[in-house]
Structure formats: structure tokens, C-alpha cells
Amino acid sequence: MTIAPSAPRAESDPSDTGIETGGPGAALLRTLTELTADLPDTDPGRVAAAALRGRSAAADEAELRALATEAAAGLISEDPAYSRLAARLLTLAVTEEAAGQGATSFSASVAVGHREGLIADRTAEFVALHASRLDALVEHTLAEGADDRFGFFGLRTLHSRYLLRHPITRQVVETPQHFMLRVACGLAADESVQAVEEVASLYRLMSRLDYLPSSPTLFNSGTRHPQMSSCYLLDSPLDELDSIYDRYHQVARLSKHAGGIGLSYSRIRARGSLIRGTNGHSNGIVPFLKTLDASVAAVNQGGRRKGAAAVYLETWHADIEEFLELRDNTGEDQRRTHNLNLAHWVPDEFMRRVNADADWSLFSPADVPELVDLWGDEFDAAYRKAEAEGLARKTMPARDLYGRMMRTLAQTGQGWMTFKDASNRTANQTAEPGTVVHSSNLCTEIIEVTNDGETAVCNLGSVNMGAFVVDGEIDWERLDETVRTAVTFLDRVVDINFYPTEQAGRSNARWRPVGLGAMGLQDVFFKLRMPFDSPEAKALSTKLSERIMLAAYEASCDLAERSGPLPAWEQTRTARGVLHPDHFDVELNWPERWDALRARIAKSGMRNSLLLAIAPTATIASIAGVYECIEPQVSNLFKRETLSGEFLQVNAYLVEELKNLGVWDAQTREALRESSGSVQGFGWIPAEVRELYRTAWEIPQRGLIDMAAARTPFLDQAQSLNLFLETPTIGKLSSMYAYAWKQGLKTTYYLRSRPATKIARAASGSAVPAAAAPLPQAVDADALACSLENPESCEACQ
């Protein structure tokens, strides 16, 4: 139940609120008054009164504070300042909860965790050795207001999902600052004083929310099982039973320790292929994927969430049509998978034939095993040769298959479009024959080579770009410093990490890839008042990406000068003097620094084969209180669910804007609810404000694709790029993804569509079932042809 606060009061005196003087209510009001001293737009009396209405007869101060936290959260949609109040109340509760378990300081917190079998010996010894210095570091950071940087929902996410808990009492044994310093200490190089300085640098970045590692690192750094990698990519099992079942085992072990899985299945023979050992015929990939589906669901990620995997299939595989039906809600359940994510690994030849309205041939890998390991011109030649030799199992119009792929995307959001040739063509790891990227990962931002003996691994972290806007400018030097520290510790994960399989450990030690990403791009544009799809925004996005790559490469070169280049250095394109931007016709903003970097790389090499990848950042962006990765905002008003009810959160930048205009009032708030968070119909606010605060549904998707393409030269891996269409159609989708391919994108992620519901209804408790957006049930050939042949005028991209 969500507490509904009463109308605001002008005063906060107990006698004016009906609160008993001297009772727990008066104590609560005093606390609220103190916490809101610098929050003039909040009303502590209103929050206190709401909390008292919801209390039980025996309520103590802690229960009243919890009720007040809920009441303040219920007012966030009226004023974002209530998020700060709710966070401050929750901070008090978390601090008391941890203290109740003995965690009264950072060193005490680690000691409790170690005693209960949560903290690794190595981390506990490091903290014990430097206890006084580390405790003082936390106290100093708290004095600077570190805890006050959290919004309510970010802090609630930390408390519910990330803070270590006592195995018996289930109470937290660390505060948010203890948690962040524990993560940093888990990455200490050794026990030296210099290591303490490095740890302090990372901790300061995290406490300022300038940078956050990905969730597996936050979950596990410093613990007894430090599995800190986010992504694992596995090559397709070989076309034999032992290999298929060995992959099940590998996936289960990786998933158990919170890794997201990307897995190719393109080597397995198609349905109807001869099995020579039994003189029978294969049932194809679907039964094996059904087993994988059940396994992924059964093995949860450290007890925190279900396992997750994405299966990639090359577009020439003869089981592609059945693959497209795996997530359907109708049909034989034995041929459906309800947990696996699906992705297409699309060669350029297929897209060219779609454009030309030519035929496309489907093969069984048993007949053309070489196709999986070829890309570019070599793939094209081998594919055409197989056609000429009559090896195809089926030939069909390429547009028919493409249309079915688009329909699956429209209906399920699945069947992500990722591009094999673009991914391999510029990949730093594919310099030599035989090293091939066979798929991306669960979130389509990782591009790394795999084979039967190597499972690709990536350690992720994200820079909060919004934190570097200072007085209307980007603080480029502080951004450089942040990237250098982030890369140092991402590289450290390679050495400290726990690897669930031998194949993963072998690959990561050889290639040492990391994935530094970004979040809060939308925050940058709001702060600088740039519409998301404006030329200025695109130019700044590209410039930020270039600077992050430049600083990351410099940091990797620093590491190579100290520790030597990666073991597989000679197998990289960079070792041949080709940096990732060299593959693109792009003008550099800092050519002198790039030239100096090239000279250093030629002399010392680099410590990492790959450095940049933009991941989705859903949870860490929530912790940091910024918008996800490189995405536009989805709404100016959105729902947050908690165990005690649903709350609405409003765009704080918009509220400040409307306050300055004098129109942030009850009428505007109600209009925002009725419009599901859109301000486009608000004629009473200036047009430039409406343009600035458009949502992802109101921004032409061509703008998102162009921005993604512009930053691609400065991403040596890839980016999780969601696309948004309120009512997807075959025509819109076919043009949109053809345009993405032509612009050279390596991957795309989910297609987001939106059910026709009102936020106001959802939050009021009278929500009706969401009506699905209308979806095409058959491919409209005319619409498909029109959109493909006229991509410049397609409505989806304008």
C-alpha cells in the first residue's frame, strides 16, 4: 500500500499538525525538520502526518521513520526534493541496521563480513593492515556529503540488492560507503601504501558517482567468490553430442556466478540432416535449445536473479524459420523457449540480397561447416560456391525471410539484429586468419573472438558523463583522470577474477579485454540544453566518445609500459599500427595526442586488446541517479515499484524548468499523468522546452542510429542500442534496420514498443490490463519493398 500524504501544511510545528508534543510523532517531526532544512520545497509536517496515519499502535521511532520514508517517496512526483528526503531517511535506517550487526566503521564491517564467511581472506587482511587510514577515508568522505548524493530509488536499489547481508539475520553488514570501499579494496594490487592510494582513488570516483563498475564487480569484489566479469561469449558447440552437453555444463557454471551468456549455435546441423552414426535424421537445433532454456532458468545467478543467455544464429542456417518461432506464445511448447534471448548474426550478403530483392539460400552446417568461420569476401565466395554446388536445403526470397525477422521483432522485441561482417571487419582481435567473432553477448555490446577452447570474457564499468558537466562545459581533464583510474581497475579484474571455467580463464589471460562504457548522456544534454537529436548533441556525443577512447588507450599504454603488453599482442591489429578509428573516415579532435599515443604504442604496445563497450547500465544508472547509457529518456514520468506499492518519479530537470516558468502546479502534474509523461501537447510551455524534453518515442529513430554510427569509430567493441517504436510495422522496421546496417552499426539490441496504457491509471491502483500494440500478422510485401527502396523517406527514421 502506498501512503497518500494529505494536502500541504504551511507550518511544521507539532501543534499545527495534530502531533502529540513529546511523543514519537514529535521526535519524527524534529528529525524531518532537520533533514529538510536545505530542502525548502518539502513539507516535513505533511510527511509526518502521513506517517502517523499509517502507524500501528506499538510503532517505535524506526517504524515511524520507515513510514515517513514511504510517505516522502509518494511525493516525489510532486517535487524531486522529496527523493532527497526519502534517501536521507533511508540512510539513517541503513546505518542503524548495519550498526546493529556490529558494522560501526568500515574496518568493523569487513571484520563482520569475514567472520560470517562473506569477505575473502585477502581483502580482510588488506583492510586490517590499513584499518585506521581506510576508516578515516570513509569518515572524511561522509563529511563531504557522500551519502547525500543518492536519490531514494538508487539508494533503495543498493540496500535491497547490493549490500552484503548477514547469512542468518539477513540484516545488512555494510553501509553504502562501506560497500563502495569494500569493492575498491577487493581490487587492491597488493598490501602496499601505494595500493591504498590506488584504492582511495577508485573509492572517491565511486562515492562521487563519477564511475561505477558493473553489477558482478559490485556484487562480488572482495568476497570469497570474486567473479566480477559481466559477459561470457561461447562459440557454438561442435556438431556432436559430447560437445553440446559440455556447453550446457559450461553455461551452467558461468550463469551460477552471475555471468550473462552469449552463445552461438550455428555449427549444429539442421533438422532433417543425416546422422551417420545411427542412419537417422537430426531434429535440428530446437530440441537442444529447449534443454538449454530449462538449464538457464534453473541455474540462478548467485541467488539474486535468473540466469540469462542470448543464442545467436547465422541467417543462412536452415533452422532459421523455426528459430524465429522460439518465443511465440502459440504452437507446440516443446518447440518454444521462454527464457532464452534470440539474436541474428547477419552477414552483409544477406542484407545486399534483401536490398536487391534476390533469393537467399539456407544450408545445414553439416554441408557447409566452413561458413561459420568466414566473414567478408571469403564468406561471400564460399556461400556462393555452396549455392552453385546445389548444397542449399531451401531457397526463398531474401525479403520474405527479412520480413519474418521484422515480424518477430515487432511481436516479441527479440531476434536482435547484429551484423557479422561489421563486427569482424574492425575488431582488434581478428587480425590473423582463424580468429573470428562468432556472436555478441547477452546485451550486444561485446565483440570478441571465440573458439571451442576459448570463452571470451569482458569486465565492464561505466563513466557517468553527466557528472562532468561543470558550469556549462565538459571538464575534460577530470574525465581523463576518471578514465585512467577506471581502466587500471578494469584491467586489475583480469588478474584477480574468479573464472568458473578453464576456457574463460585462458581467454581472458590471453586477450585481456575490458569494456569501459558510459551512462548519463541524456543528463549531459539536459544540463547543456541540447535536444537529443540535434547536430550539437551528435557532435558532443562523438567528441565524448573520442576523448574516452583516447584516455583509455593512453591508460592501457601506461599499463603496458609497467607490466608488458597483452600475451596476444602480436595477433592484434593495433600491433600492426592500425587503431580502431583508422577504419573510418573521421576527423580527430585531438590529432597531436593521437600521434603521441601511436608512437608510444609502437614502442610499448598495449595491455588490453579491447577497451570500450557501452553496456545498458540499467541498475548502476539507477544507483547513480542518471539516465541509462547512451539512451534518451523514455518518459518524463515513470513508475517505480517497491514492496509497499508503486510510486511515480518525475524528470527533475523538467520540474526545475517548469518551476522557473511558474507552471509547475497541480494542473501541469495532472496533465503529465494523463499524457503518460509527454509534454508535447503542453501549449502553455515554450516550444524549445517541449523539444528538449521529448521522449525516446518522440525522437526520430534515424537520429539515434546516426548518433550511434558517429560514435562507432571510438568504440572498439560495440554498444547496446535500443530502438523505440510505439506501433511497429513491417515497413517501419525493415527500413530502420536496413538503415542501421548501411550506417555501419555492429549491433542493435531490443526493439521497444509500448502498450497503450496510462501512467495515471497504473499508479492509482485501478490499472487495466495492458493492451498490446497492434502488430502485423503477415508480411506486407509492398510496404516492405517501399521502405527498403526509399529508406530516406521512411517515417520510422524521420
What is the predicted role of each segment?
Residues M1-Q798:
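Extended catalytic cores of very large enzyme megasubunits
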